[in-house]
Amino acid sequence: MFKLTVKPAGTSRRAAVGTIWALRALVLATGLVAPLQARAQATAGGDPPPSLWTRDTLSGEWGGLRGALGLDFWATGFYQDVFKGTGEDDGDLCGRVDLMINGDTGKFGLWQGGGLHAHVTYRGGDLPGFRGGALLPVHTSGVLPLDGKDEVVAASLYYSQRFGDARLMLGKINALDLPARHPFFGGWGTDRFWNVAFVAPPSGVLPPVIMGGILTYSFAPYSLTAMVFDPNDQTNSYSFNRLFADGVNVSLSLARSGEFAGRKSGAAITATYSTAEGTDWSQIGLPPGSQTTTKEGSYNVAVDISHLLVESARVPGKGLGLYVKAAIADGNPNPVKRSFVGGVAGHAIVPGQPLDYFGVGYFFFNFSDELQNAVAPVGRFNDEQGIEAYYAFVPTPWLRLTANLQWVNPANGANPSVWLGGLRVRVAF
């Protein structure tokens, strides 16, 4: 699933806090200056600037700087409590700050089609990612980026280039950035669902942060994507010293988007193979005295299907949609054998609340039989399933208030089912 890495020395909490204060100062300064610049532009162009309550961000367009840099900056606060199950206690709080840059080389007066991209995060607080005996994180932002608590982490640093109908991405890429615009999956845990099963369904062969390349070629209504990347998580890596030293992962995906029954629909199949060695779950050193060995080669094949059930009368292409992702894997050394994630999500269909959105989903993960059999002498290790529902109240485009409820039947067989509730506040600066 997710692979932990060691945090490099030299990155201190003081540096992280200093960076966050610098970002806050930048937001404050631009928030004060941008309205004056916008007013001047409105006077010259004749169009009034959007009001505080109708613009997309709290601090406005920063005098054109935001558009030039393709900059997004948001802060998210979380509260979550266990209502029933192991670990019933008082609720906990945490926070996270995200800065994304998607610079266009053409806007810088350079070549056309190029892009410079970065995703920098900082997270802190005491809200744990794992609760109630669940193997999958119930609070994704409390775990990812890996080992990134109280640290400033550049989870994405990559270059992109368009060649007609093709797009190439090279560098360090946060895998959670890839489904960012999906109406059901994705969201980093700062938007839509909290549980990692919905945010980024674990495949066993895709680390949270990859180092490598992604090539996408579009030939409507199809698109073909090829990925080549190092099998290890690269969250704390900023060099190419050991790139592909432990093997290589290759992924191919074919997607089709169009209409079915007059409404927006899509389907995709993705196959990923890794040459890296992984733990042989049939030999993991249990019981004491036995030897842990490794096994080479792992795969995952997934199918995604989406269909718009009810289209929004206000926003074409949005509405109430059905989304499903099913996958099979080798089960050894991949800790996942099968998985199913699906549900519905609604956008722009709530009467009187055009910006509100919601989602309800179910997940089931069937883990490796070899792993479960090996653990059996010392404890019960079951499959894991759960249900999650959320509703996002959006009074203005830059403010999202989300209520969340989860039920999880954890993989740890010694733990009963757990109920969790959460509140989330996200402000786009």
Which functions belong to the PLM regions below?
Residues 53-71, 102-116, 165, 221, ...:
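Short loop/turn motifs that connect adjacent beta-strands in outer-membrane beta-barrel proteins
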Residues 81-95, 110-157, 242, 411:
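Surface-exposed loop and membrane-interface regions of Gram-negative outer-membrane beta-barrel proteins
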Residues 164-165, 196-312, 316-330, 346:
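Signature for the C-terminal beta-barrel architecture of outer-membrane proteins
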Residues 130-158, 165-253, 372, 379-380:
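Surface-exposed coil loops of outer-membrane beta-barrel proteins
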Residues 71-79, 116-122, 168-172, 224-230, ...:
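Transmembrane beta-barrel strands of outer-membrane/channel proteins
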